[in-house]
Amino acid sequence: MEQEQDTPWTQSTEHINIQKRGNGQRTQRLEHPNSIRLMDHCLRIMSRVGMHRQIVYWKQWLSLKSPTQGSLKTRVLKRWKLFSKQEWIN
């Protein structure tokens, strides 16, 4: 079996911790120094995807033509505009 070669990318993004055990053996542990940042980035992307799904859902709902939904449609549109402004500011 071949071992993976370290590329400049893996060398720069992974941090190697070498520890000594009680019996003198050395152990290597790979850690990502920016793992918290990476998780945060993934969560942001996932929330954007969720927001996009909400937008698609509301657009589909608002496209339904029904006289009883006329007033609801304007209220939802106003609320949605306020909500989306706040989301982008945050």
Swiss-Prot record:
Coiled-coil intervals, chain numbering: none
Superkingdom classification of source: Viruses
BP-aspect Gene Ontology terms: symbiont-mediated perturbation of host apoptosis; symbiont-mediated suppression of host cytoplasmic pattern recognition receptor signaling pathway via inhibition of MAVS activity
Biased composition (Polar residues): 1-27
Localization per Swiss-Prot or TrEMBL: Host mitochondrion inner membrane; Host nucleus; Host cytoplasm, Host cytosol
Keywords assigned by UniProt, alphabetized: Apoptosis, Host cytoplasm, Host membrane, Host mitochondrion, Host mitochondrion inner membrane, Host nucleus, Host-virus interaction, Inhibition of host innate immune response by virus, Inhibition of host MAVS by virus, Inhibition of host RLR pathway by virus, Membrane, Modulation of host cell apoptosis by virus, Viral immunoevasion
Pfam families, per the entry: PB1-F2
Cellular component annotations (GO), alphabetically ordered: host cell cytosol; host cell mitochondrial inner membrane; host cell nucleus; membrane
Physiological role: Plays an important role in promoting lung pathology in both primary viral infection and secondary bacterial infection. Promotes alteration of mitochondrial morphology, dissipation of mitochondrial membrane potential, and cell death. Alternatively, inhibits the production of interferon in the infected cell at the level of host mitochondrial antiviral signaling MAVS. Its level of expression differs greatly depending on which cell type is infected, in a manner that is independent of the levels of expression of other viral proteins. Monocytic cells are more affected than epithelial cells.
Family: Belongs to the influenza viruses PB1-F2 family.
HAMAP family: INFV_PB1F2 (MF_04064)
Name this polypeptide is given: Protein PB1-F2
Natural source organism: Influenza A virus (strain A/Chicken/Hong Kong/FY150/2001 H5N1 genotype D)
